[in-house]
Amino acid sequence: MKKQSFFYLLSLFMTVSFAFTSCKEPVTPEPPDPPLPPDTSEVVIPKTEWEKADSAYTRYDYTVPSHTALKIAITACASDPSEANLETLRLRISELKPKTEPYCMVANINGDPKTRMAFNWFTNDSVFEGEVQIIPVENATVEDFEGNNGVITIRADYERTRKLRYAGKARYIVNAAGISAADRYNYIAHKALAENLTPGTAYSWRCGYDGHWSPIGHFRTEDANQGEYTFVVMSDSHIENPTFIKEARRCAKAVVKTVPEARFCCFPGDFVEDGDASNSEWEWERWFEESMEPVIKAMPMVVTDGNHDDSPNINYTYHFNTNNDFNQNYTSAPQFQGIVYGFVYGDVLFYVFSMQDFWRETHSYLDWTSTYLTDHIGSWFRDQTMANPGTQWRVSLAHFNLFSGSDHSTDKEPPVFRHCMLPVFKENEIDVALQGHDHTYEVIGPVDPDSLTPILSAISDREEVGGGNNKNMTGYKGGTYCTDDGTFYFIGATCGYKRYYPHSRERMEREYTDDINLLQDDKHHNVKNYFDLFTGMFGQPEKPCFTAITVKEDCLEFNSYLADDDQGNASLLNTMRIVRTKNHSIPTMMQ
């Protein structure tokens, strides 16, 4: 009985428990844990070819120019990874130059060109070593230098250039290379001066230091008794983007191919487009490394500054090595060093000067005065003439115009320049004034410095070819111009892409005011019958232009050429002769 009761109670308990459990809500099973993410610590996302290049090659290990070229290629690939762009990228990698190598090299006439030559170049900020090697071998090779056969070595001085704005306002390079407009780079500027060279000798030169050399350049010292020779003048390259770079390089290649015998190249300013505080060192770099590279390797440069070259960074001073006596010896020194200097080559006295600093000391647009020009530049002209009174020819080189016939003719500065400099030109009997700034081909004068009229009796042999248009507003070509009683003014258009166009007679008459005492403004040029001053070819040739000037026994022969293509071919634009029948006199203030 007890045993049955136990099993009965156990059965009853299990029945009740089952019933109770059956009445509860069904239990939803817990979801399984989500799978763990894959372990990515060892996974490397493949980089593109240009991304690898961007991280592998840094600016601090290579020269600034070669690394910027790589940055342009990287940016192009990131936008369009075509095979052509990738090939360019690989080429730029192969062209990278170690940071120790020099760039922006140039030779400058500095002092007596029979026995002296000056040199200038840049390196990255960390390179303080520098020297020039010169060898009396024409078209020398690296082997000639390595053979140490008469190599002259000159140690260079250096100056650290701090925080030069690299891109600045040059929008092309900002976009093309992904460089900030505010980026500033440091460089070392190296300067060396060779003295006691042998007159009439062809030299080759290179700069840098042991194992880190520039390409080889060439020059020839003036002969001891220099006879006939040729020099070149061109200006206003205004480097700012590839189109401007290419046009100026066309001109430089044409110079070297057309007149390989040229002794030097005159360049009166506006090397670059962007001046002021937002200027671009990249533009200067491209002028040296690309645009003018053919000429720079072939001959020394004779330079002075233009208004687009001015900047607080004084890039101009860092890049050239010209005579600085004016800054050291005259009361009012200009901003840049070496923009006012003279030299004699053969039978020509060259006055290289700048009117850019005319505003220093007392000046007035109202009465057209500048004590800087009249007192300091004027005194310097007299000193140059006094030191070299016997040359047959006197030629000035400056950027700004005393006379011009395009967009700058109505600026407010030319009346100041005329009022201050015409008496100086008259006193020193300047034969030829080589000018820039106006970007048009302009033959002016000879101009009587007192009446401001052309001396028509001094002109002969002009050819009438039809004009009245932008190609040739006057319709004249060629001609012989005698400078006995007035100066011949010349603007050789532009070696680059930035072009202005000639003003017509009608426009010049509208721009004239018959009250020359009025304040000069942007509408008036203040010279009556101004168009008559344009006595020869006057127009826009629409191609890069340079002029070869040959100093002959009886004349200065001008041959102007247009650069036709990228191979250095050129076509003749115009030929003129400058003659003189009187001997030069000593300025009256010196007698």
Language model features with spans:
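Metal-dependent phosphoesterase/phosphodiesterase active-site architecture
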Residues: S94-E131, P136-E146, G150-R165, A170-R171, ...
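Beta-rich interaction/scaffold domains
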Residues: K24-L96
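Short, surface-exposed alpha-helical recognition segments that flank or form part
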Residues: P65, I239-T243, S278-N279, Y365-Y372, ...
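C-terminal motif of bacterial Sec signal peptides marking the signal peptidase cleavage site
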Residues: A19-S22
